[in-house]
Amino acid sequence: MKPYRIKHVPTGLYYKPGEVNLTKNGKVYTTGVNAFSYFTRGYIPVSARANSKLHTSTKGVIQWEPTAYYPSRVSARIPIEQFIKEEI
């Protein structure tokens, strides 16, 4: 299998598991196990720090909501249809 990354098409950013999920580099996958295989409810949850560069630059594209337990974070549920596999 060719290496690939998961790209969020509207922002051009890549998905990476962890606390901040959208980055310029993302994670390189070499197997079939990825965000598409373990998020099966039709959306991929993402998070960021409130008022960070990521948060402020994507406000018009992603509908961010404050998190209940971490006031310094925001989160969103992005439909899987907005992501694609991009081979490297």
Regions found by a protein language model. Give the residues of each.
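Short, mixed-charge low-complexity intrinsically disordered segments
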Residues: 37-88
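Short aromatic-glycine-(Arg/Gly/Cys) micro-motifs in beta-strand/loop hairpins
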Residues: 1-45, 50-51, 56
